[in-house]
């Protein structure tokens, strides 16, 4: 059997890091098993769901290097949901209810006041037909009837054996009074129709899983394998879309590389060390979902920021060739020169300026004679990365300066700043004419 997983975001906002982590782990899991990956948009909430959000979610996943085998919108499947809904209604596994929101809130408060679990009392099942006729169709909503005699259990790939006493579960609302579906039933129908074999999601869905297992059973369908990830926390607050959290847009504002994000989320919540990679495919090797633990997982944006320069340093010219071409950089020499000294990709623009002809050298008065001497012993012939070694040897024959007192004045003269990448790599980029111009700057002052 081919493994099939799905990532099912609701297009009512941007992806936050909790979503991204779930999507990544789900993607890595199925790709590690040569499985298929479904992107499902849970857009049954037609008022809040927006095409702009749907497009942004798809673009964000692509930016993170995640692909999918096919996608589906729940909003295109209402006829199918109606078909299954009517079947379950006929089987008396779904039943109509008539309470207002205010009545339900009152019942809940009274149950809590009496120390009872806030479970729906199934009063709608006790109504006579005459009593039902008093309500208009607009007042009717529907619940799925839980078999409360069962102990619902499953073997969770992260949490081990999980059990729920169905007597403590309230019959879930599956259809609202306005005719729209809640999350529960359409999700199960889709999982059945698209042959979903494994479901990876947050631990906040555990009680939903217990309910949905009964729905799978009611529809005589195979129950998928479940993995419930611990939730992400930032400063002891759960990260979610509604209460706020880092979105991919926030991460892009920080100019974080996709693989800094992926490398981080692939390992936090496990005991494995975080190792940076430049391609998402590298994270598939040896992926093991059982390594994720049950403890709350702390998210720290500073940790991702620290990974960013490490990812950039490991990137080859081919990894960034397209982005460099947008800056009119076609040679690998500049990237090889600066990649180990940038915190974010845009930092390269400063080095483009430094390597350009507009840079003003910095030559201290006390170093002017030294720079003139250094220029006089600059090697002839082709300039390559060995030129620096020869040049320094020539300089040391003419001065008793220590290495530090040689390197810093030369760096200031050649770049205008006191720190940066290896000068050996800079010389071929500048070329002889520009080197002579910069070193000869003091004589023109």
Curated annotation (Swiss-Prot):
GO cellular component terms given for this protein: cytoplasm
Higher taxonomy: Bacteria, Pseudomonadati, Pseudomonadota, Alphaproteobacteria, Rickettsiales
Organism encoding this protein: Ehrlichia ruminantium (strain Gardel)
GO biological process: glutamyl-tRNA aminoacylation
Purpose of the protein: Catalyzes the attachment of glutamate to tRNA(Glu) in a two-step reaction: glutamate is first activated by ATP to form Glu-AMP and then transferred to the acceptor end of tRNA(Glu).
Keyword Metal-binding among record annotations: no
Keywords noted in UniProt: Aminoacyl-tRNA synthetase, ATP-binding, Cytoplasm, Ligase, Nucleotide-binding, Protein biosynthesis
Record-given protein name: Glutamate--tRNA ligase 1
Enzyme Commission numbers on file: 6.1.1.17
Main location: cytoplasm
Subunit structure, as described in the record: Monomer.
């Amino acid at each position: 059997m081919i493994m099939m997983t799905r990532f099912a975001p609701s297009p009512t906002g941007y992806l936050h890091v909790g979503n991204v982590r779930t999507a990544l782990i789900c993607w890595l899991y199925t790709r590690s098993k040569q499985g298929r990956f479904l992107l499902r948009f849970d857009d049954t909430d037609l008022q809040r769901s927006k095409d702009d959000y749907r497009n942004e979610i798809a673009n964000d996943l692509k930016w993170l290097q995640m692909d999918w085998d096919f996608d589906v919108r729940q909003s295109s499947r209402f006829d199918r949901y109606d078909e299954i809904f009517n079947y379950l209604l006929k089987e008396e596994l779904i039943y109509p209810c008539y309470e207002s929101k205010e009545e339900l809130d009152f019942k809940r408060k009274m149950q809590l006041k009496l120390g009872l679990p806030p479970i729906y009392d199934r009063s709608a099942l006790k109504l006579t037909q005459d009593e039902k006729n008093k309500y208009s169709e607009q007042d009717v909503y529907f619940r799925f009837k839980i078999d409360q005699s069962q102990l619902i259990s499953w073997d969770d790939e992260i949490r081990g054996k999980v059990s729920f006493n169905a007597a403590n579960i309230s019959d879930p609302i599956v259809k609202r009074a306005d005719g729209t579906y809640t999350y529960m039933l359409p999700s199960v129908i889709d999982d059945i129709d698209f042959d979903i074999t494994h479901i990876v999601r947050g631990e906040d869905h555990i009680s939903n899983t217990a309910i949905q297992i009964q729905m799978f059973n009611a529809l005589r369908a195979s129950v998928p394998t479940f993995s419930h990830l611990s939730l992400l926390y930032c400063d002891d607050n759960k990260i979610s879309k509604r209460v706020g959290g880092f979105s991919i847009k926030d991460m892009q504002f920080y100019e974080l590389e996709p693989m800094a994000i992926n490398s981080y989320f692939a390992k936090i919540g496990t005991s494995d060390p975080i190792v940076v990679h430049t391609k998402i495919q590298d994270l598939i090797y040896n992926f093991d979902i059982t390594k994720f633990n049950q403890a709350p997982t702390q998210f720290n944006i500073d940790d991702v920021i620290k990974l960013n320069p490490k990812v950039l340093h490991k990137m080859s010219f081919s990894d960034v060739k397209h982005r460099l071409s947008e800056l009119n950089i076609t040679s690998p020499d500049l990237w090889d020169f600066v990649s180990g000294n940038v915190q974010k990709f845009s930092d390269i623009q400063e080095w483009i300026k430094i390597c350009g002809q507009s840079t003003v050298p910095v030559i201290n008065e006390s170093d002017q004679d030294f720079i003139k001497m250094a220029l006089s012993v600059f090697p002839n012939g082709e300039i390559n990365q060995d030129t620096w070694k020869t040049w320094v040897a020539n300089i040391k024959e003419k001065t008793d300066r220590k290495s530090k007192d040689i390197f810093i004045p030369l760096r200031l003269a050649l770049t205008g700043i006191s720190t940066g990448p290896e000068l050996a790599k800079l010389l071929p980029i500048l070329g002889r004419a520009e080197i002579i111009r910069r070193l000869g700057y003091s004589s023109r002052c």
